[in-house]
Regions:
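Flavin-dependent oxidoreductase catalytic cores
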Residues: 1-172
């Protein structure tokens, strides 16, 4: 599995919020997708058909000026056309900028504060609610976005995000 999500390295290239490059790997959607696409191509070249190559992929970064559905759908279509992936694992959020977008539910602020040195914990008490917005949990919270990917792609898709009961495993 290649990690193209949560604003880790390859995902950061695709995010307009984080990628401020002015060379061939920045700028428009195509430029920002270039480096991850090249990496996937080299991986496929190295392993051939002997290993399934899948990618965890952000449908949305969950941050202002980040990667959102329109661009992520376009990139996913390019990834499928490239033919270097056997499946796409759909997710969203930014470990760097908005971790709760993926986890959903009530923010465990007391636990965050308790795990930090005293001064950092004090800062979290004051600024934590601004840093960690709350997103209500609901079953299969990424399913509405994933359905748009299903309509646009023919490759196998795997869905993350609140898959807690068997019914959602069937429809996703």
């Amino acid at each position: 599995e290649v990690h193209l999500g949560h604003n880790y390295l390859l995902s950061s290239f695709m995010s307009p919020n984080l990628n401020k490059r002015r060379d061939r790997y920045g700028g428009n959607t195509s430029g920002r997708a270039e480096f991850p696409r090249r990496v996937l191509g080299r991986i496929r070249e190295a392993v051939g058909d002997q290993v399934a190559v899948t990618a965890k992929f952000n449908m949305a970064d969950g941050v202002p000026k980040g990667l959102w559905l329109d661009e992520s759908l376009q990139i996913a279509q390019w990834l499928e056309a490239d033919g270097n992936l056997d499946a796409l694992q759909l997710t969203g959020g930014s470990s760097l900028l908005n971790g709760m977008y993926f986890f959903r539910g009530e923010v465990p602020m007391a636990e965050f504060v308790a795990a930090q040195p005293k001064l950092v914990g004090y800062g979290l008490k004051i600024y934590g609610p601004r840093i960690f917005p709350t997103y209500p949990f609901e079953e299969a919270f990424f399913l509405p976005m994933a359905r748009q990917f299903r309509e646009a792609l023919s490759m196998p898709l795997i869905l993350l995000g609140g898959i807690c009961i068997f019914v959602y495993r069937q429809v996703s």
